[in-house]
Swiss-Prot record:
Stored InterPro entries: AMP-bd_C, AMP-bd_C_sf, AMP-binding_CS, AMP-dep_synth/lig_dom, ANL_N_sf
One GO CC annotation: peroxisome
Family, similarity comment: Belongs to the ATP-dependent AMP-binding enzyme family.
Domain free text: Both substrate-binding domains (SBD1 and SBD2) are involved in the substrate recognition, and are sufficient to confer the substrate specificity.
Positions of region (SBD1): 281-348
Record's keyword terms, sorted: ATP-binding, Ligase, Magnesium, Nucleotide-binding
Residues that, per the record, bind (E)-4-coumaroyl-AMP: 258, 326, 348-349, 353, 455, 459
Record GO biological process: phenylpropanoid metabolic process; ubiquinone biosynthetic process
Protein name per its UniProtKB record: 4-coumarate--CoA ligase-like 2
Binding site for ATP: 207-211, 215, 348-349, 353, 438, 453
Residues reported in the UniProt entry to bind CoA: 279, 461-462
MF-aspect GO terms: 4-coumarate-CoA ligase activity; ATP binding; CoA-ligase activity; trans-cinnamate-CoA ligase activity
Job description of the protein: Carboxylate--CoA ligase that may use 4-coumarate as substrate. Follows a two-step reaction mechanism, wherein the carboxylate substrate first undergoes adenylation by ATP, followed by a thioesterification in the presence of CoA to yield the final CoA thioester.
Amino acid sequence: MQPDAAATAHPSLSFYSAATGLYSSLHPPLPLPSDPSLSLVPHLFSHLPLHHHSLLVDAPTAATLSCADFRRLVSSLAAGLRRRLHIARGSLVLLLLPNSLTFPVAFLAVLATGAVATTMNPSSAPAEIAARLRDTAPSLVLASTHNAAKLPPLAAPLVLVPDTFQQQHDDDQFDFFFHALLETDPETPVEMGVGVGQDDAAAVLYSSGTSGRSKGVVVTHRNLIAMVELFVRFEASQYTRPARDNVYLAALPMFHVYGLSLFAVGLLSLGCTVVVMRRFNVDDAVKAIRKYKVTHLPLVPPIMSALLRANPPLELDSLLQVSSGAAPLNHTLIHHFLHAFPHVDFIQGYGMTESTAVGTRGFNTCKHKKYASVGLLAPNMHAKIVHLESGSCLPPGSYGELWLHGPAIMKEFCFVTGYLNDDDDAFTRKDGWLRTGDIAYFDSDGYLFIVGRLKDTIKYKGFQIAPADLEAVLIRHPEIIDVAVTSDEDEEAGEIPVAFVVRKSGSTLSCTHVMEYVAKQVRTRRSYTTQHSPYFLAWEHYKIIITASAQSAFLLARVSNSSKNGSLQALCPPVQINMADIS
């Protein structure tokens, strides 16, 4: 994609200041709450409708929670956590939960106690869970019965959480959840967010950042309130259709910032209906869309690809809008989607864990339908496009690194136990600006286009994979003396990981053995086949040292050519490294 040629003339544009190099939102600024003692849950409840509308629906069982049910359950669980387990300000609670009706209740109840919540994929391998427990030292773990058996030894209390509020179980830990819900009379008001305010930490959400191993992103109550107002509620205000009439399908994981911001927090303030899927499956999603007359479907590129591959082609008449985020979409996929679903309003958005999912949002108008763009800057947000070498600010039509500034930008990184800044925190957040690591440009209408990435994280189906995390797993193998992990492009997944392995001299380590080793250490999913599958290569007589960075792409191309003349030995034909999968 080429930048807008008209922008190269640098006209006088309302969203760009040539004097400062800053980009501002074309949307008017929105007032945000000024009370420093305000926390997320009271703010959310101030918007939550009082009528007995179905706020949450469990897609598999059709169980529902009304707005009144939801308010009561959050209040009751918060009181139970305080009184029975002494969860309060200074506590950290790990949510190891799948999508369910109970996830939003549990997440907000933890915040209502004044504690900090941290989320994790419930399908994580025991070694990954153990590492997270070491990093965060939680006061309490909330887990599902589906993954309780594989939990490593815990130093903190464990409470098993059901998928719905009608579920029964013989386990005493499971029963505690229900007893905690009975701690307060439904009619008795419960004080929310005791002792915490807007500047206090609310959640630690893990991200690969721009480099290195995964680290915790500390987001505050102010960040989450800004997300509710600048992302979810602002977008709803731009349409004439009442938000309460919308039905959203929650096919994205709530442990990820994209799903969390929408389904466990923001959309609840609108009083619309959220239909919750445990995990994405095309057939189940289609059934849910038709059964519940879903109007809005937030998704990531692999879900869009799966919908387009359905045979016979789908007819989803109730859908009004599909929004894509978390990973780039290629032009071919966009074209096919617009052709298959011409009645659907398709938009893209841009946000990061570090920006609490706030950044840009697409809006289609009679004048502008820029489907390949990630949209306009959100209200109250500012941006820079920074030259990669000189550090100077660039005008519209010029490529550079995207920097963001605004009330949704994270507080800090935490990397080890406690809220300690990681070494690259100052690099990532410079004078309040978030360096995204993404290469982008603004066109002459203020629309943002993402064209590449500086950072070495791998975007697999919308999930971030840190090469350093995979390298740390592989290098622990006794027959591997060096390893470099990079990525290769893939039409369906976006990117897939590739590992270059150096074996010990004389080792007969095979690709199959390496794969079996990785599978025991890293969360895996069902096989995923592609013509551009990743593969292992080994060097026995000499060693190449390379970090997983921009050099890796160059190495990948060189390796492909070198292997043809025998200078490199392929351990086996191309195979798949099974990574996180939302399907």
